[in-house]
């Protein structure tokens, strides 16, 4: 009986996790040549007002890039230079643009949102 209860609790937690709203990011992966422009799109949770971009270079820690609120950059890191830009063009998607990619831009990019 105890084993059944534990299995039921785990299943319930997994099921609850699947129904939570989530942030969607496209494309899921991008391969490009150096010097090309890349646009990464993020669809945040609908009622969220704050948006964030992070990146993680292979073998390194996750780095904060920029936060965005009320259609303006609210905070940015030192690595967020003129090569990068963010915008929320249609009021729902939140984009990160890398104007001219360099080898050191090779990384996993993550978006997030909060209320």
Curated annotation (Swiss-Prot):
Signal sequence range: 1-19
Residues linked to a glycan: 93
GO terms under biological process: adaptive immune response; cell surface receptor signaling pathway
Main localization (coarse): membrane
Disulfide bonds: 42-111
PROSITE patterns, per database record: IG_LIKE
Ig-like domain ranges (all copies): 21-115
Keywords: Adaptive immunity, Cell membrane, Disulfide bond, Glycoprotein, Immunity, Immunoglobulin domain, Membrane, Receptor, Signal, T cell receptor
InterPro entries the UniProt entry points to: Ig-like_dom, Ig-like_dom_sf, Ig-like_fold, Ig_V-set, TCR_beta_variable
Keyword Ribonucleoprotein: no
GO cellular component, one term: T cell receptor complex
Cellular compartments annotated: Cell membrane
Presence of the UniProt keyword Transferase in the record: no
Quaternary assembly: Alpha-beta TR is a heterodimer composed of an alpha and beta chain; disulfide-linked. The alpha-beta TR is associated with the transmembrane signaling CD3 coreceptor proteins to form the TR-CD3 (TcR or TCR). The assembly of alpha-beta TR heterodimers with CD3 occurs in the endoplasmic reticulum where a single alpha-beta TR heterodimer associates with one CD3D-CD3E heterodimer, one CD3G-CD3E heterodimer and one CD247 homodimer forming a stable octameric structure. CD3D-CD3E and CD3G-CD3E heterodimers preferentially associate with TR alpha and TR beta chains, respectively.
Entry function: V region of the variable domain of T cell receptor (TR) beta chain that participates in the antigen recognition. Alpha-beta T cell receptors are antigen specific receptors which are essential to the immune response and are present on the cell surface of T lymphocytes. Recognize peptide-major histocompatibility (MH) (pMH) complexes that are displayed by antigen presenting cells (APC), a prerequisite for efficient T cell adaptive immunity against pathogens.
Protein name: T cell receptor beta variable 2
Organism of this sequence: Homo sapiens
């Amino acid at each position: 009986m105890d084993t059944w209860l534990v299995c039921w609790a785990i299943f319930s937690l997994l099921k609850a996790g699947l129904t939570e709203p989530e942030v969607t990011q496209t494309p899921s992966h991008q391969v490009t040549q150096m010097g090309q422009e890349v646009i990464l799109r993020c669809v945040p949770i609908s009622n969220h007002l704050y948006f964030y971009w992070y990146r993680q270079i292979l073998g390194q820690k996750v780095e904060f890039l920029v936060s965005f609120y009320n259609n303006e950059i609210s905070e940015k890191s030192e690595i967020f230079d003129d090569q990068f830009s963010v915008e929320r063009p249609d009021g729902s998607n939140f984009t990160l643009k890398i104007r001219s990619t360099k080898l050191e831009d090779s990384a996993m990019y993550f978006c997030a949102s909060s209320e």
